[in-house]
């Protein structure tokens, strides 16, 4: 038998009736093929402007999280910027981003896949979006939540590790509804409720042990999820999702357990500059231990983001975490 153990100090918020404690998690696996999979989700990665300048100068804005990222079996983030030299900025948008292709090696070093389902993938139009997909494919970085047509945009990211088959789906819910993939044109996957549910069911039918929707949703600057987010997150779990992960508001939005399954409403920013309010300068990295039964253990690791958009581990911070199918969100001390 193989065993992996984790010691986490917990200190719940005052609303909880118990005091600080140390939780001892042990995960057993009978064979190597059934060992838990460590999966990481990061929030918004914007690799232009300050972060882009860091990379162009030979730096790596993700270096301070290298040990954590390198330890995971698979790493996913929301790519909040097209990577291209072509295209034109969207005339009616206040903020448009475009990263130089020089950022691709750094992205490839730290992440295995990215979601394109967000409101900035189309900042420089279809030309830059197509170039982004080519750069990612050439570098061996998988992408989902966007594609050359509707079918490709809704196609899951498939992860097959240690005998566990995971399907990750990406959707954009930022309004006004724009840059949506169609039957014969490129774009991102829009969060149309019935289509999302159909995609979850299709992934389960195709053999997924676990299905994880990665949503780009919610209101910017709002530190609590909307009723829409809560209602739809719970519906996705009712329809078979193992957990739900979100981003977009540029702030974290807390977590809940629904029917024994975690919902992390927003991870906030991870690599991003240009924000003048403190809530946007702290994000979460979500680390999961998974097997065929679902989520064995999950934790959020806080990142403090500096003026250049570089995240730094916030050692000692207390952030949401949980174990197995327990109906309780704990607060764990970051290492």
Which ranges hold each PLM region?
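N-terminal secretory signal peptides that target proteins for export/translocation
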Residues: 1-13
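N-terminal secretory targeting signals
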Residues: 6, 30-34
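Bacterial N-terminal signal peptides
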Residues: 19-28
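Acidic, metal/ion-coordinating pockets
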Residues: 33-335
């Amino acid at each position: 038998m193989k065993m992996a153990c984790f010691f986490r100090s917990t200190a719940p918020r005052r609303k909880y009736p118990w005091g600080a404690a140390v939780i001892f998690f042990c995960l057993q696996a009978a064979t190597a093929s059934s060992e838990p999979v460590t999966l990481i989700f990061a929030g918004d990665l914007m690799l232009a402007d300050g972060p882009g300048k860091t990379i162009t100068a030979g730096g790596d804005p993700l270096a301070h999280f290298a040990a954590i990222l390198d330890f995971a079996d698979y790493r996913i983030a929301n790519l909040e910027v097209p990577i291209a030299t072509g295209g034109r900025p969207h005339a009616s948008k206040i903020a448009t981003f475009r990263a130089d292709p020089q950022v691709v090696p750094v992205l490839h070093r730290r992440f295995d896949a990215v979601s394109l389902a967000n409101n900035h993938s189309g900042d420089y139009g279809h030309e830059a979006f197509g170039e982004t997909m080519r750069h990612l494919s050439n570098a061996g970085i998988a992408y989902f939540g966007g594609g050359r047509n509707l079918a490709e945009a809704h196609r899951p990211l498939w992860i097959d590790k240690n005998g566990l088959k995971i399907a990750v789906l990406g959707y954009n819910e930022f309004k006004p509804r724009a840059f949506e993939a169609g039957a014969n044109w490129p774009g991102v996957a829009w969060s149309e409720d019935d289509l999302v549910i159909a995609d979850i069911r299709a992934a389960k039918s195709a053999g997924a042990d676990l299905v994880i929707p990665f949503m780009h949703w919610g209101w910017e600057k709002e530190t609590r999820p909307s009723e829409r987010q809560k209602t739809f997150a719970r519906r996705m779990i009712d329809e078979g999702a193992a957990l739900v992960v979100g981003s977009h508001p540029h702030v974290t939005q807390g977590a809940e357990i629904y029917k024994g399954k975690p919902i992390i409403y927003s991870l906030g920013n991870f690599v991003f500059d240009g924000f003048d309010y403190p809530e946007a300068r702290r994000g979460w990295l979500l680390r999961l231990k998974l097997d065929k039964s679902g989520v064995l253990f999950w934790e959020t690791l806080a990142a403090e983001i500096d003026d250049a958009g570089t995240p730094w581990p916030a050692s000692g911070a207390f952030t949401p975490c949980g174990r197995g199918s327990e109906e309780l969100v704990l607060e764990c001390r970051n290492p």
